[in-house]
């Protein structure tokens, strides 16, 4: 948006040091203000049929967001649930799949394979900031986060080449350095509600906005209904066309680029959940 490139800082240490000192002074004097976010599009699939909107902050905003994330991540780590695996230190998809297998082996063979509609784009600012304020009391930090969330979006018209500026009333832009952390935070209450406070004792495994609820036979439909209500109360939407209830004993399902099926051991004759990369991955 401002035409400043990170390569400018990389080339010249003296320029970089002066730039960082000036930025530190802006933060100290509280004169720093977030800049508009540049909207770009990338293809979501190899067939190039669907596009995903990204919001790219300026270099200055990325640096400040990165510094804030370094400070805030350990604070919120204390609240994040053990079954949440995305954007966290020393966690990856294979650990999430191990938790899925563990739940299946415990008899939770009915799966709510949930799809959230445009999750990053729909996160309501007011409710998210309320969640942030539970742990962060520093008004300056709260104002920074509010400013990043509400930064206008700049998009170049592909036909005319003219810039269009629109206000950002909800969502946290995919492409922002702090966005994954905020997106994780907003679903933390759901992690605890399903895993710790639900009388059916299901297991929910979440990787950002990809999630599964694994339950005993006969419990999945009710849990899917409750999930929909929980999301609606927080101004989020369940994509009902893509969300499905799976009896894993009868059909396979995909999660995080893996296909899960039940197989029988050749020697032991015992059934076990088999995980392998999907064709799409």
Predicted regions and their residues:
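Duplex nucleic acid-engaging cores and interfaces of nucleic-acid transaction enzymes
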Residues: 55-69, 93, 97, 101
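Non-catalytic, polymerase-adjacent accessory regions of viral genome-replication enzymes
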Residues: 1-17
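Acidic/histidine-rich catalytic neighborhood
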Residues: 247-267
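Charged boundary/loop elements
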Residues: 1-3, 70-86
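Conserved phosphate-binding loops in nucleotide/dinucleotide-binding enzymes
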Residues: 51-58, 269-272
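Heme-based O2/NO sensor domains and their adjacent alpha-helical segments
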Residues: 17-44
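Conserved polymerase palm-domain catalytic core
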Residues: 34-35, 40-41, 79-88, 94-248, ...
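Basic, alpha-helical interaction scaffolds
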Residues: 264-281
């Amino acid at each position: 948006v401002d035409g400043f490139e990170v390569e400018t800082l990389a080339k010249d240490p003296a320029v970089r040091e002066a730039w960082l000192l000036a930025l530190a002074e802006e933060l100290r004097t509280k004169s720093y203000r977030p800049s508009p976010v540049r909207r770009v599009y990338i293809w979501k699939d190899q067939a190039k049929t669907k596009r995903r909107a990204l919001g790219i902050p300026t270099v200055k905003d990325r640096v400040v967001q990165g510094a804030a994330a370094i400070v805030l991540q350990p604070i919120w780590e204390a609240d994040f649930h053990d079954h949440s695996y995305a954007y966290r230190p020393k966690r990856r998809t294979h650990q999430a799949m191990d938790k899925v297998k563990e739940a299946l082996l415990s008899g939770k063979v009915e799966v709510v394979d949930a799809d959230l509609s445009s999750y990053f784009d729909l996160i309501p600012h007011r409710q998210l900031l309320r969640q942030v304020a539970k742990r962060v009391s520093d008004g300056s930090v709260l104002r920074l986060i509010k400013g990043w969330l509400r930064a206008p979006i700049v998009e170049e018209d592909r036909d005319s080449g003219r810039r269009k500026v629109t206000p950002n009333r909800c969502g946290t832009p995919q492409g922002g350095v702090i966005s994954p952390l905020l997106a994780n935070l907003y679903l933390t209450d759901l992690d605890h509600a399903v895993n710790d406070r639900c009388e059916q004792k299901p297991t929910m495994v979440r990787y950002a906005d990809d999630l599964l609820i694994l339950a005993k036979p006969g419990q999945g439909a009710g849990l899917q209904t409750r999930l929909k209500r929980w999301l609606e109360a927080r101004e989020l939407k369940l994509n009902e066309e893509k969300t499905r209830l799976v009896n894993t004993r009868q059909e396979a399902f995909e999660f995080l680029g893996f296909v899960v099926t039940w197989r029988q051991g050749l020697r032991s004759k015992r059934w076990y959940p088999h995980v392998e990369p999907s064709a799409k991955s």
